[in-house]
Amino acid sequence: MTAQSPAPDLYPPVQQEIARLAALAEVRSAFAWFRAHESRLAEYQMEVARIAAPPFGEAARGAWLAGRFRESGLSDVDVDQAGNVFAVHPGYGSRYVALSAHIDTVFPAATPLNIRQQGTKLYGPGISDNGAGIVAMLAIAHALQAAHIPHALPFVFIGNVGEEGEGDLRGMRHVFATPRWNQAIAYSVVVDGAGSDTVVAEALGSRRFEMIVRGPGGHSWSDFGSPNPIIVLARAIDAFSRTPVPVLPKTTFNVGVIRGGTSVNSIPESASMRVDLRSTSMAEIDRLEGALRVALERAVKLENEAASLHTTRKPQAIQSEVVEIGNRPAGELATDARVFKVIRAVDAHLGNAAQVQRASTDANIPLSLGREAVAIGGGGSGGGAHTLQEWFDCNGRDLGLKRILLTMLALAGSGE
């Protein structure tokens, strides 16, 4: 699937349904609510951004969100064992349309959070990713309650943990691994960051490893010839970097972190590196993982053999360990999936130009399971994600919120 996927005019029945929904007095009232309460939404966004939520440290932010869900009038507010926060807007069916946004950030707990507003712009770490997504959920919840919009399938709102970095999508994994929600969620709409110009309908797969090498260590002069963990990693990187990768399916690898050693005249006792493998094909990721493991095994063997030639005493052998620190499955939404038709028809109705993209988001989990899911932005615009200079511009937020609301209502079906 690409940005040149079938045009929305191939889905006239869906477009007609979107036009009907948008003309309802209740929906127009919800649209008006978005505009009238922008200042309140901006306050919510700054409030949540001031609560640190590093990976595996989201509890305080989760408690805040549970309180806001209750305040909005949603029912069945709950926090599961993983820390995911749930709330329900009732309907008439047994299956749900899920609206989710991750509540974690990439920033450590001690990061200075200088959250502030200048005009229509909000500034500070996490203000857009994923302050914008969290506030979009709250806006939809409040507007549904205020406008009394009927819909058939109920909505479940999920503030999930563990999307960023080493969180490895743990929150969404837990949602789809639990009997309560595994089969109950019919459609998933993930709100991640700012903007209204993308539709993530293709999940980028990735696998990450930490490779650790340990040896006896020693002095660079008196223990010369003892096996060196850093040299092992250098050999492994050199060999692995020669692994061919295809242009299609697009496949990449990266050695992003190397650690080891204490001084220039010390043979290190240990060294490690972190490697990131990505592809649109899980088979290619499997192939790269195999090549990476072979490269390390051969490098260890070569260094142990070399060490035995440089000393008269039997050297202590190098040992290696490979630890998987991330595994995000790939997946792709079919172009005839209802959620894809709906979001494209919504964009056509709103005159919104959005491109279909591939990315790594919480939608990876349902997509990898063959479920219908997309990830979209919460409106407005943003930049500087994952930096202290992150920003969000509230201008255009209402377009993103209209987009989310119409998509949710169309997926849920009429409650009339």
Please place each PLM-identified region on the residue numbering.
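Acidic/histidine-rich catalytic neighborhood of metal-dependent amide-processing enzymes
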Residues: 126, 130-204, 246, 412, ...
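Short glycine/proline-enriched loop/turn "hinge" motifs that connect secondary-structure elements
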Residues: 107, 149-150, 200-206, 264-269, ...
